[in-house]
């Protein structure tokens, strides 16, 4: 019994180390993509930045595209979490909480938002990550459905103007995009531009 427990503990510890190393790879890759641009970053440079061997990167990700799409998924998951928190607050009476959560999550790191948008275009036809891109689109549709349901309830309560729910959602999206553009210009003025 004791050897089974210690064996299970070893397996859990190995999994924990594996996941920590995977996150280290993603963090290194993201920093390089933002600093150097996608095309100038290689799996070797990611490995060097993460302080591991190139072969170790391939134990986690078969291709550079898998690393790129993982960055996209992580970003979208963070937005999904924030929007869900905002929807819950909106349901509890803070009518602007969902829009605020959306704005804050998109504007917290405009350079990352821009990178993810660029990656979506770049990877749109990549067959090796088609399943992951579909997962991304499922998350986005779920976010949109949650927002539309919440907005419909706010319209029904008379809190928001009675127009189709997607008008409100798209207005928030357009404002976030406009704000992101202003933030990008400000970042460019200071000389810290992102090369993609």
Regions flagged by a language model, labelled:
Residues 73-79:
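Short, basic, alpha-helical segments at the C-terminal edge of helix-turn-helix-like DNA-binding modules
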Residues 1-36, 40-49, 66-69:
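Basic, helix-initiating cap at the start of DNA-binding domains
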Residues 70, 84-112, 168-172:
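Hydrophobic alpha-helical connector segments
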Residues 50-61:
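Short hydrophobic/aromatic patch on the recognition helix
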Residues 80, 84, 127-159, 166-171:
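Amphipathic alpha-helical packing segments from all-alpha helical-bundle domains
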Residues 108-131, 181-188:
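Amphipathic alpha-helical segments used for helix-helix packing
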Residues 28-32, 105, 175:
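Short amphipathic alpha-helical elements of helix-turn-helix/winged-helix folds
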């Amino acid at each position: 019994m004791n050897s089974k427990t210690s064996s299970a503990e070893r397996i859990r510890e190995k999994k924990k180390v594996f996941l920590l190393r995977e996150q280290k790879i993603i963090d290194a890759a993201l920093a390089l993509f933002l600093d150097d641009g996608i095309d100038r970053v290689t799996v070797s440079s990611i490995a060097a930045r993460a302080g591991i061997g190139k072969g170790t990167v391939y134990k986690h990700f078969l291709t550079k595209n898998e690393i790129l799409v993982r960055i996209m998924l992580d970003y979208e998951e963070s937005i999904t979490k924030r929007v869900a928190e905002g929807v819950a607050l909106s349901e509890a009476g803070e009518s602007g909480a969902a829009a605020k959560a959306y704005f804050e999550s998109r504007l917290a790191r405009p350079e990352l938002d821009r990178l993810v948008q660029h990656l979506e275009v770049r990877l749109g036809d990549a067959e090796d990550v088609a399943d992951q891109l579909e997962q991304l689109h499922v998350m986005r549709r779920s976010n949109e459905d949650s927002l539309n349901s919440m907005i419909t309830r706010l319209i029904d309560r008379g809190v928001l103007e009675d127009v189709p729910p997607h008008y409100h959602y798209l207005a928030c999206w357009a404002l976030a995009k406009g704000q992101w553009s202003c933030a990008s210009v400000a970042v460019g003025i200071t000389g810290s531009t992102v090369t993609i």
